[in-house]
From Swiss-Prot:
GO molecular function ontology, one term from the record: magnesium ion binding
Chemical reaction(s) catalysed: Mg(2+)(in) = Mg(2+)(out); Co(2+)(in) = Co(2+)(out)
Organism: Thermotoga maritima (strain ATCC 43589 / DSM 3109 / JCM 10099 / NBRC 100826 / MSB8)
Record-given protein name: Cobalt/magnesium transport protein CorA
Record-annotated site: Essential for ion permeation: N288
Residues on Extracellular side: 314-324
Amino acid sequence: MEEKRLSAKKGLPPGTLVYTGKYREDFEIEVMNYSIEEFREFKTTDVESVLPFRDSSTPTWINITGIHRTDVVQRVGEFFGIHPLVLEDILNVHQRPKVEFFENYVFIVLKMFTYDKNLHELESEQVSLILTKNCVLMFQEKIGDVFDPVRERIRYNRGIIRKKRADYLLYSLIDALVDDYFVLLEKIDDEIDVLEEEVLERPEKETVQRTHQLKRNLVELRKTIWPLREVLSSLYRDVPPLIEKETVPYFRDVYDHTIQIADTVETFRDIVSGLLDVYLSSVSNKTNEVMKVLTIIATIFMPLTFIAGIYGMNFEYMPELRWKWGYPVVLAVMGVIAVIMVVYFKKKKWL
């Protein structure tokens, strides 16, 4: 089914839950509850079975995949006391990254990207996070994400994640998402290297199309990174009560990573813009080379055509026409002229 546009919400009152993304069959709820000593994980499609974790005394990660199920989003929102406008933003997948602070929770919108090597396109997916006292709610559009490293650390008690509260889980999820941006930038860097080689050695129409697509990808990435910097800046500067002081340096570290990513994106944009200029210059040079060859050929044939034109005149008294060696002599003269001109052009380095 086609993706709904924002116009689908026209005329509806604020807080009306309308999903604006692509409808998919995927739907599941993943729950990970843990402490230093214990760990519990399960998947379900029954929303009622996960609601009791709201009052858990240990950190819980509830990942809801398939937000086209607006009834599930509404039920979770009602039970956890989430504002209707926040639920509306969760279902409106065209949000820019942002953070909003409420009395009992923190709401964050992020973007997750996947790179299609065949189409050379970025596909974005909105990921919404809600931090409560002991719980992190995550809302995704489809199955498949970049958070498996976090899952592994929780399952096998690696690092300090199971010694920390839910705010550290929130940091870990954001950090995993930002780390994936570095992987994405490596793929884009490889694509730039390939395009540079093609532009310099064998520029084709497909090359410039891929270059334009790469430029669009970088613009899309830039539109995500810049507001993400504001999100992380708010998390470590305007520290909400739900985030402990010990966790603040971790958010500052992720913020530093976003600055590095933003700088890399700007560098890549400059390189790609330069590639387009190089492509146009290469095409222009090839055209000039062709025109030069054609001009030289035309110049060589000008005196030959002149000689042929003289002897093509229909005058009755032209002595050379009746001369036995006239024809081979004229051909020889024309050949000598052509050779002299070719030698002259090579001496001038025009050939």
